Amino acid sequence: MTIILHRSDFFEAILNHEGSSVAVVENESGASFCYSSLLNSVARAKEQLLAKTGKCDTSVSGERIAFLVESGYEYVVTLLTILACNAIAVPLAPSFPAPELRYIINNSEALALISSAKYVSKAEEVLAEGLDNTPLFCQLDGTRNISAIEEEVKLRDFSDEPRGGMMLFTSGTTARPKGVVLSQTNLTAQAKCLLEAWKYAPSDRLLHVLPLHHIHGTVNALLTPLLAGSSIEFMYPFNVNSVWTRLAAPFLENEQINGHSEKTNGAQKDETRVPISFFTAVPTIWSRMLKAHDSLSHDMQAAGKIAVSPNNLRLNISGSAALPKPIRDGWIQLTGGNVLLERYGMTEVGMALSCGLENTDRVDGSVGWPLPSVEARLMETDDETEIQRIIEHGAEIDAHSGKERIGEIQLRGPTVFTGYWRNPEATAKEFTTDGWFKTGDIAIRRQVPESGLGKSGSWAKGPAYFIQGRRSADIIKTGGEKVSALEVEREILALPEVDECAVVGLPSEAWGQKVAAVIVLSSKVGGSMSLQSLRSALKTRITAYKIPQDLEIVEFLPRNAMGKINKKELVKSVFGEVEKIRRRSIDLQTKRPVLNGQRG
């Protein structure tokens, strides 16, 4: 029997990959699944989904289908099944409370909610109340069962226009999250630009420790490796000791791997001991990896170092938040020269900018260059007149002041999303009249010696981009000067007493805004830190007006699943509401002396 699936770049690639190559490995169970089985599983699941929803190929086209499935083969099959139906996949985070999941289901107007066996009770809780229209509830049976006789798969073009894709929800700070609609064309373009820049290959084994309701986990670590024929090994949620054990496993004897040999047998055991060549994560994960290495056994430390050396870990990527220099430098030292590659992206556009594969193109503090097919520009806004000007290449330095010009990153190209779901006003607000997406992120462009020469590809040429922060949260206007919170954070994090840091702008009677730091002290170094000692430590590192004028020490900094800090909420929780901050500002002016001629 022949199975027919709609043609797409993803399905065409999967069909053409070596059938015996491993597509997915589930680390916990040791189960592995080959590329030859994947489309068969998708075809069977598609038949079930259409039958359970009472739809056909044409009537399901463009419908939103939510799913609550754990990381692993079943997730991959479910996502591809929805794409095969020409529908829009809406991945749900199992960690979210029921009210948040109900909001996403309501907002997306989901036709159906698919659940794995693991999350049936969670799905039933979500469906029990509070929904405008209750979606059909269904399970796709047997997605993990591999048929002994694999049927021939053929692809055909869509009978109607492609309307499928994925809907991811942005994390709202002042409003409820918005549904970002990414068409299959967007997803394909996003995956292809990464494939060209980062050179995914069938020989790659990618360790997947990320949540799958964010762009990082779905496009960078799932769809792109599938397009390339790489192997994806799921190991979520992240556990630092488990990850070090997995990385070290290929370089240890069986008896040295605590309990690992008991979980697997035969060929499957071998799959969980294939060296990891590709690991993409967020800065908090890299920080925890560095800290945990010292606590490993001597044998595990030695094997771990071999595992993450440039000879074995081909590519280590950091993103979704700024990478502190101490983490970057610490990883280079631990690995014997493996430089973390930084990149920049967001839900609406996938990845947009990236450093290159060549070490000279992995520039400290930079997110590199526009990826293949991505157009990027910087738009400068005059604070007084609100007049906007494009910062042309070669004009990065202001001719009058001699300072670097800063502007908003704006993007255009096939990777950019089609719009916010059922929200034309918000969509129109985020695009310029000439069709560029306004990211809200502020950056400078700078030519860096020995980099941007095209060694990593023709796309990685010229001046590199350096993110200064979010326009709304990370650009602090104090006494007529603009301060990048990210720049100040990098310098504070270079101090040995500091473990974590967030720099924010607070209302100030004297300066409009003042720079403030919220710090977690290092448990290794110990001791304390006062505002005066912080300012003294920074006065030789950054200009006086950038040095924090306020300081709070906290036990921890709250972060979301991707390691990001909501600075608006942080200011409220640490410093209080605006009027309280203003009173604090007045009080501090009367109590605090000016240090060494700097503003207090």
Swiss-Prot record:
InterPro entries: AMP-bd_C, AMP-bd_C_sf, AMP-dep_synth/lig_dom, ANL_N_sf. Substrate binds at M346. GO terms for biological process: fatty acid metabolic process. Induction: Expression is induced in response to 2-benzoxasolinone (BOA) exposure. One of its GO terms (molecular function) is medium-chain fatty acid-CoA ligase activity. The keyword Transferase does not apply. ATP binds at residues 170-174, 214, 321-323, 342-343, 347, 441, 471, 564. CDD domains: MCS. It is an enzyme of class 6 (ligase). Its EC number is 6.2.1.-. It comes from the Eukaryota. Residues 343-420 are annotated as: SBD2. Pfam families: AMP-binding (PF00501), AMP-binding_C (PF13193). Disruption phenotype: Does not affect tolerance to 2-benzoxazolinone (BOA). Oxalate binds at K564. Residues 241-342 are annotated as: SBD1. Keywords: ATP-binding, Ligase, Nucleotide-binding. PANTHER family: ACYL-COA SYNTHETASE, ENZYME, PUTATIVE (AFU_ORTHOLOGUE AFUA_7G01530)-RELATED. Both substrate-binding domains (SBD1 and SBD2) are involved in the substrate recognition, and are sufficient to confer the substrate specificity. Fusarium verticillioides possesses 2 unlinked loci, FDB1 and FDB2, necessary for detoxification of antimicrobial compounds produced by maize, including 2-benzoxazolinone (BOA). The FDB2 cluster arose as a duplication of the FDB1 cluster with rearrangement and expansion by incorporating additional genes. CoA ligase; part of the Fusarium detoxification of benzoxazolinone cluster 2 (FDB2) involved in the degradation of benzoxazolinones produced by the host plant. Maize, wheat, and rye produce the 2 benzoxazinone phytoanticipins 2,4-dihy-droxy-7-methoxy-1,4-benzoxazin-3-one (DIMBOA) and 2,4-dihydroxy-1,4-benzoxazin-3-one (DIBOA) that, due to their inherent instability once released, spontaneously degrade to the more stable corresponding benzoxazolinones, 6-methoxy-2-benzoxazolinone (MBOA) and 2-benzoxazolinone (BOA), respectively. Belongs to the ATP-dependent AMP-binding enzyme family. This is CoA ligase FVEG_12633. It comes from Gibberella moniliformis (strain M3125 / FGSC 7600) (Maize ear and stalk rot fungus).
